[in-house]
A protein has these predicted regions:
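Interfaces that engage single-stranded nucleic acids at replication/repair/recombination sites
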Residues: 11, 24, 125, 145-150
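ER/Golgi luminal nucleotide-sugar-dependent glycosyltransferases, focusing on the catalytic module
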Residues: 143-392
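Charge-rich, low-complexity intrinsically disordered regions
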Residues: 1-7, 11-47
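Short, hydrophobic/amphipathic alpha-helical patches that form generic packing surfaces
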Residues: 22, 118-125, 242, 349-353
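Cysteine-centered metal-binding/redox modules
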Residues: 46-147
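Short amphipathic alpha-helical segments that mediate assembly, nucleic-acid/protein binding
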Residues: 3-4, 20, 71, 78, ...
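Short, flexible helical or helix-coil boundary motifs
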Residues: 27-31, 82, 86-89, 180, ...
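Membrane-proximal basic amphipathic "stem/tether" segments
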Residues: 6-13, 67-83, 151, 373-392
């Protein structure tokens, strides 16, 4: 097939992306994983191992190196862990949970002579306490017994507002196509748009739905269903969200759904929302083993969890900042799932309306700050490095 700038960007990727396997394919002239239509060679698609990187090869080039925390920080961390253990009544994790944690830690690159480079804790002790959590998000607090998931159906429901003045909606789809093989169930797209004849008022100029679908065809992003919605600048994703949920409605205990939206489409191409989006795709989709493990223990999981906002009726006042999250279908659709606040932030607030904080797990950057600020990303760099090194 012909090479072009779009495919080159998809393959090579930037810091925090997971395109190395595709970059190797690019250099060898085999792009079968993205668009296998070369009439001469027609190379087969890459095999997907959903237990490792969710259909995208783990990236060996992301993140920096990680050093053991200072003695002071290790003492501080140990003191905090001890205080938490005592406050929890010194409850230990179940035998099966401890074994699973220790098995993960045994081969982890962060394991340095029995201590975790990520947090500085002694692994043997850390894995005992039920409320401890891996600093790299590979195992989580054991609040309740796990509900095993077997051969899960993995759905994707996705919202895009294709703002015309920048390429960020394409950038998001470029991220998604690299990981689409993770989704073995439904892949459902909602497109919010402004009709061509619109004018005046709070209008966000967009490209038309047919152009979005054409771009998806160009890069090989396949959908099982799609629908266009006239954009409402006061409600945003809230307009399409009930329909998206309806398309995956099921109480199958082995069915899981990922919701996301094209992030940063109203901002410039070099805004902090670009790295925010890339980090969310990476964390939520590139280590399926960790995500499944979290979903076996919690009803909903995501990244950049924050507390204290969205004081609407019935909301438990927590959310995944950035609005990327996985949920168990049986946990959602066995409840009243279609009450979405008719406010612009309704979809971001929805998890906190559905579930208490203890029913959720954070895959990365718990208690996150304001991610629109570059200073917050500077603070997060060590967490990024820890997450990446743990998956090398």
């Amino acid at each position: 097939m012909d090479k072009n700038e779009t495919f080159y960007a998809l393959c090579h990727g930037d810091r925090g992306q997971a395109g190395w396997k595709y970059f190797v394919a690019w250099e060898s002239g085999k792009m079968g994983a993205v668009s296998p239509h070369d009439a001469n060679t027609n190379p087969p698609a890459f095999e997907v191992d959903a237990t490792t990187a969710g259909g995208v090869a783990a990236c060996n080039g992301c993140g920096g190196s990680v050093s053991m925390p200072s003695v002071f920080d290790r003492i501080k961390s140990a003191a905090g862990a001890a205080a938490g253990f005592i406050a929890d009544g010194m409850q230990v994790a179940s035998d099966s949970e401890r074994e699973a944690r220790q098995s993960i830690c045994k081969t982890c690159p962060l394991n340095e002579a029995g201590s975790c480079v990520g947090c500085g804790c002694v692994i043997e002790l850390k894995t005992q306490a039920r409320l401890e959590q891996c600093p790299a998000g590979r195992w989580f607090p054991e609040i309740c017994a796990a509900i095993p998931i077997t051969d899960p159906i993995r759905n994707l429901i996705y919202h895009v507002l294709p703002v015309a003045r920048n390429s960020n909606w394409k950038r998001n789809l470029d991220q998604l196509v690299l990981r689409q093989d993770l989704f073995n169930g439904k892949r459902v797209l909602a497109i919010a748009y402004e009709p061509r004849e619109s004018g005046g008022g709070r209008i966000v100029p967009t490209v038309q739905p047919d152009e979005v679908l054409a771009y998806c065809d160009e890069i090989g992003m396949n959908w099982t269903d799609s629908r266009a919605f006239v954009n409402d600048t006061n409600l945003g994703e809230v307009v399409s969200f009930p329909w998206l949920l309806e398309t995956v409605k099921s109480t199958n205990p082995n069915e899981l759904t990922f919701y996301a939206h094209a992030k940063g489409v109203t901002h410039s191409d070099n805004h902090t929302t670009v790295k925010w989006a890339e980090r969310q795709y990476r964390v939520c989709l590139d280590d399926w083993a960790a995500v499944q493990r979290a979903l076996e223990q919690y009803s909903i999981v995501g990244s950049f969890r924050r507390f204290g906002e969205f004081a609407t009726p019935g909301n438990h006042r927590w959310h995944f900042s950035g609005t990327f999250y996985w949920f168990r279908n049986d946990a959602v659709f066995s409840r009243i799932w279609n009450k979405v606040d008719r406010l612009y932030f309704g979809v971001e607030a929805w998890p906190g309306k559905m579930f208490k904080p203890e029913e959720s797990a954070c895959l990365f950057a718990d208690n996150a700050g304001g991610m629109y600020l570059e200073t917050e990303w500077e603070k997060l760099q060590r967490q990024i490095d820890v997450w990446e090194v743990a998956r090398r």
